[in-house]
A protein has these predicted regions:
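Active-site/ligand-binding-proximal alpha/beta "capping" segment
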Residues: 63-102, 109-114
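Structured adenosyl-cofactor binding patch, chiefly the S-adenosyl-L-methionine
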Residues: 98-140
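Residue-level recognition of oxygen-bearing side chains
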Residues: 51, 95, 124
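RNA substrate-binding interface of SAM-dependent RNA methyltransferases
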Residues: 2-64
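A short acidic, often aromatic-flanked loop/helix-cap motif at beta-alpha or helix-coil junctions
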Residues: 51-57, 71-73, 119
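Glycine- and other small-residue-rich loops at beta-strand/loop junctions that grip anionic moieties
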Residues: 20, 93, 117, 121
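Short, glycine/charged-enriched secondary-structure capping and boundary segments
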Residues: 24-26, 78-81, 102-104, 127
C-alpha cells in the first residue's frame, strides 16, 4: 500500500478478525522501509480502531466497502459514479459479520465487488488500490 501512494492505513478490529494484536511499531518500520525504497519522502500514518462502528464514526472519508454481495464491480462503480473514494473497507479473512454489513448499509456506504474469486484480505486491498490508482491515472 505504501508503494501505491496511500496516505493512511487503518486497521479495524472486526467481529471475525483473528485474535492477534496489530503490532503498530513493527508496521511503522515496514512502512518507513517501503517508503524509502519507492522514493517517498512522507510516510503513511497508521491508525487502529477497536470496531467498524468506531472507524465509521471517526472517519470522514468517502468510503466504499468490498464484499462478495456487491452488485457492481469496482471498475463499473468508478466509471459510473462521481464519488472519488478515498477509503476502502476490506473485510477480515472471516468475512464481515451480519451486523457489520448492516452497519455499512445503514451508513449508505456503496458495496462493490472485486470479482468472482474470494480474495485474501491483503490481496483484496492491493487489488482495490491498484484498480483505483489505474482508473484515475488513465482518466487524467
Amino acid at each position: 500500500a505504501t508503494e501505491l501512494g496511500v496516505n493512511k492505513l487503518s486497521f479495524v478490529r472486526m467481529d471475525n478478525s483473528g485474535k492477534q494484536k496489530i503490532q503498530i511499531p513493527r508496521l511503522e518500520k515496514i512502512v518507513k522501509t517501503a517508503s524509502k525504497q519507492c522514493g517517498r519522502t512522507n510516510f503513511p500514518s497508521l491508525k487502529e480502531y477497536d470496531s467498524l462502528k468506531d472507524f465509521l464514526y471517526l472517519n470522514n472519508a468517502k468510503t466504499i466497502a468490498a464484499h462478495k454481495s456487491g452488485d457492481r464491480f469496482l471498475s463499473t462503480f468508478l466509471f459510473k459514479n462521481k464519488m472519488k473514494p478515498s477509503s476502502v473497507i476490506i473485510g477480515p479473512e472471516g468475512d464481515f459479520s451480519k451486523e457489520e454489513l448492516s452497519l455499512i448499509q445503514q451508513n449508505n456506504i456503496p458495496i462493490i465487488s472485486l470479482g468472482n474469486r474470494r480474495l485474501r484480505s491483503e490481496t483484496a486491498g492491493v487489488y482495490a488500490l491498484t484498480s483505483i490508482n489505474e482508473y484515475y491515472l488513465n482518466k487524467n
